[in-house]
């Protein structure tokens, strides 16, 4: 589903406008501290800009003119996978992945069915009964990806998805991401040009608060 983003956030010096076509993956690159993660937070609904609008498939999710429109994060069908996995320590892997659909109102059984399907898709079904502290960095990142997919988002936002993975595991995860993103609308923040080429259809550059 296509995504259209336009907003300004003076505190971060951002004046942003870009579009992502249906089924397209776009990489977002720029210097450290330039605001790449902030852009994802605005799109996900975790941060309200000073002004702007956001459309997903022609449906307005944010329009800050006049009385304003702002759809909360849980109703946007947009999922953000943060740079750190942030798995819930008191839940095992299966219930971490099932947490999203369960919170959205799916039954316990349906949430777990969806979680198992996503664990299988990311090659992590064997970790279903482990806790977060029992996973390596690469395993945690794969589980976080499964959790993001279990929410069945229309747009997937990935913030440096390979940053927490060692060199040995990064190639496997890169190949997995490339395969999963083939049929999804996504925005991937990455500092690595190789990751951008492997994962994205095109690359946007953030410079001095604007997309180039």
Language-model segment annotations:
Residues 59-64, 109-127, 178:
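Conserved ABC ATPase "signature" region
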Residues 61-79, 103, 108-109:
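ABC ATPase NBD coupling module
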Residues 131-135, 139-141:
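Conserved ABC ATPase signature
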Residues 133, 151, 182:
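Conserved signature/switch motifs of ABC ATPase nucleotide-binding domains
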Residues 156-160:
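Catalytic Walker B motif of ABC-type/P-loop ATPase nucleotide-binding domains
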Residues 170-182:
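Helical segment within the ABC ATPase nucleotide-binding domain
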Residues 183-190:
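Conserved H-loop
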